[in-house]
């Protein structure tokens, strides 16, 4: 009976995956269907949202029918995560909006102060951070350099996946219109960033981890919507201050919670900006 239930569960997961693929194909519907790279919201929590639910990691067709239950349990234990991931999403500090190229869009003096305050705040939380990953855009790199002064022993790496962009056409529609190709190009990359960085811990990870991603407002807002299984097109309804901290927790069972969203309360009021 246990094996039968597992097979049914595995079939449901497979059906869900096939459903996501089918949803991305055009059926003569609206442009939003074609441009969306995220699974449609159902109103129910998808336990296998990161495709790392232990049952989905097991090739059920290889399970021996006679020793099925015991063999299946061994496989499930092998793929079962043990650690919790703590992910801090930091929005870059204020930068010069009038720069002609990304190289020219450096932090303002206020932006450098904001990054300094964010670095102090992260250090004061007392966590043993495992890694910092930052966007390759100038404003994110400069924010990282300043924050790193307060976390000198934390390894850093960069990722183009975290660069700013337009993830999906927002709802409700806004006045600053963008052509479809912008979402068509940026959307899959930002979705790829979500899938690459936001998931439950690897089964081999023994201890809880504390990771920092330093990137951009659109990326963070989209990631929050996807991680909490909110409609992804709602991303623009969220507003984030420069240098703010958003804190996600991913449990071994795949449950996700948010402990901070755009927190900038550690900054004096006169140092807060949103550009």
Swiss-Prot record:
Belongs to the phosphoglycerate mutase family. BPG-dependent PGAM subfamily. SMART domains: PGAM. GO terms for cellular component: mitochondrial outer membrane; mitochondrion. It comes from the Eukaryota. The chain crosses the membrane at residues 7-24. Phosphorylated by the RIPK1/RIPK3 complex under necrotic conditions. This phosphorylation increases PGAM5 phosphatase activity. Keywords: Hydrolase, Membrane, Mitochondrion, Mitochondrion outer membrane, Necrosis, Transmembrane, Transmembrane helix. It is found in: Mitochondrion outer membrane. This is Serine/threonine-protein phosphatase PGAM5, mitochondrial. It catalyses: O-phospho-L-seryl-[protein] + H2O = L-seryl-[protein] + phosphate; O-phospho-L-threonyl-[protein] + H2O = L-threonyl-[protein] + phosphate. Displays phosphatase activity for serine/threonine residues. Has apparently no phosphoglycerate mutase activity. May be regulator of mitochondrial dynamics. May be a central mediator for programmed necrosis. It holds the Pfam family His_Phos_1. It is a single-pass membrane protein. GO terms for biological process: positive regulation of mitochondrial fission; programmed cell death. Its EC number is 3.1.3.16. It comes from Xenopus laevis. The gene is pgam5. The N-terminal 35 amino acids, including the potential transmembrane alpha-helix, function as a non-cleaved mitochondrial targeting sequence that targets the protein to the cytosolic side of the outer mitochondrial membrane. Signal peptide: none annotated. One of its GO terms (molecular function) is protein serine/threonine phosphatase activity. PANTHER family: PHOSPHOGLYCERATE MUTASE-RELATED (PTHR20935), SERINE_THREONINE-PROTEIN PHOSPHATASE PGAM5, MITOCHONDRIAL (PTHR20935:SF0). Its main location: mitochondrion.
